[in-house]
């Protein structure tokens, strides 16, 4: 989201010239940790509901969704902002000739591929775990065929540099990096990829809500859609 949100911040200057927007881009899991430890933040956009649920006070009685009992967001501000797709991307020239998730599953079983994936504590890694479960793949048994990234950007870089034969990344990251997407995971394989957003409790709730409202406008959505996002339904 680095590129899109940076562009949108520039556009927002025409709407609110006195508002200074500072971003902190990282994996959703790391951002959750930073916010829960007191990092200064007014608006949170997560790459999956899990990390948003973990700070949603309306779920404080649900220990599975909010295990630490955090109450950090303005609950009424929470929305499903964007939808992404989980894709199988390959380096330039696709040297391994990978064409689909079905084929990838067979290559993993034979140990004849190097796949880049996200760590289990970040959303892209969690979606990958669901894809493995769909194909009946044991991640631990595939250790010699897997290389990991701390976030989706690291996975994307491994594919771009051809240090892996392919990688499981978001459609938007593949688009931004100019990578070829050979297949997209279905909802049956890993569920929908929803990006929730919410204002955090604090002194700047009004300004944060105004920017969140702007993110839902046609102007902002056009930027998101240019790299493969769609508005969440």
Report each predicted region and the residues it spans.
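Hydrophobic anchor at the start of a short beta-strand
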Residues: 21
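Periplasmic-binding protein-like
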Residues: 42-46
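Exported/periplasmic ABC-transporter solute-binding proteins
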Residues: 1-16, 29, 33-36, 48-49, ...
């Amino acid at each position: 989201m680095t590129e899109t949100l940076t562009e949108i911040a520039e556009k927002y200057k025409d709407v609110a010239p006195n508002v200074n927007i500072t971003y902190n881009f990282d994996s959703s899991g790391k951002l959750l940790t930073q916010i829960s430890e007191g990092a200064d933040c007014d608006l949170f956009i997560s790459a999956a509901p899990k990390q948003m649920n973990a700070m949603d006070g309306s779920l404080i009685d649900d220990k599975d969704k909010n295990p630490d009992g955090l109450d950090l967001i303005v609950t009424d501000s929470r929305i499903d902002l964007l939808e992404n797709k989980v894709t199988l991307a390959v380096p330039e020239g696709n040297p391994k000739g990978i064409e689909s998730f079905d084929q990838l599953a067979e290559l993993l079983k034979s140990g004849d591929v190097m796949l880049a994936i996200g760590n289990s504590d970040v959303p892209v890694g969690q979606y990958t775990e669901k894809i493995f479960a769909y194909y009946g793949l044991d991640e631990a048994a595939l250790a010699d065929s897997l290389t990991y990234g701390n976030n989706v950007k690291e996975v994307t870089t491994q594919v771009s540099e051809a240090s892996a034969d392919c990688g499981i990344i978001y459609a938007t990251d593949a688009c931004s990096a100019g990578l070829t997407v050979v297949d997209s995971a279905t909802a049956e394989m890993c569920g929908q990829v929803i990006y929730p957003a919410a204002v955090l409790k604090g002194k700047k709730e009004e300004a944060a809500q105004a920017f969140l409202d702007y993110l839902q406008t046609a102007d902002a959505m056009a930027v998101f859609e240019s790299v493969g996002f769609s508005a969440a339904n």
